[in-house]
């Protein structure tokens, strides 16, 4: 036989358990080359620069 819960999980307890599942807000910074907002520690998708250096083999987006 399988184990069965002793009591029904209340709405409050269920929601408190899920309160840690929320997504975090992204931390955006300005690109040092083109001043667009980008995520930290990522290559700029608009100009292809990372830490003031051009990343080789990176295809920058031109749609914006």
From Swiss-Prot:
It holds the Pfam family Ribosomal_L32p. Keywords: Ribonucleoprotein, Ribosomal protein. InterPro entries: Ribosomal_bL32, Ribosomal_bL32_bact, Ribosomal_zn-bd. The gene is rpmF. The lineage of its organism: Bacteria, Bacillati, Mycoplasmatota, Mycoplasmoidales, Metamycoplasmataceae. GO terms for biological process: translation. GO terms for molecular function: structural constituent of ribosome. This is Large ribosomal subunit protein bL32. Belongs to the bacterial ribosomal protein bL32 family. GO terms for cellular component: large ribosomal subunit. The keyword Ribosomal protein applies. SUPFAM superfamilies: Zn-binding ribosomal proteins. NCBIfam families: rpmF_bact.
């Amino acid at each position: 036989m399988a184990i069965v819960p002793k009591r029904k999980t209340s709405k409050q307890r269920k929601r408190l358990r899920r309160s840690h599942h929320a997504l975090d807000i992204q931390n955006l910074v300005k690109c040092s080359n083109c001043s667009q907002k980008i995520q930290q520690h990522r290559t700029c998708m608009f100009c292809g620069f990372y830490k003031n250096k051009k990343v080789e083999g990176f295809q920058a987006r031109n749609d914006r």
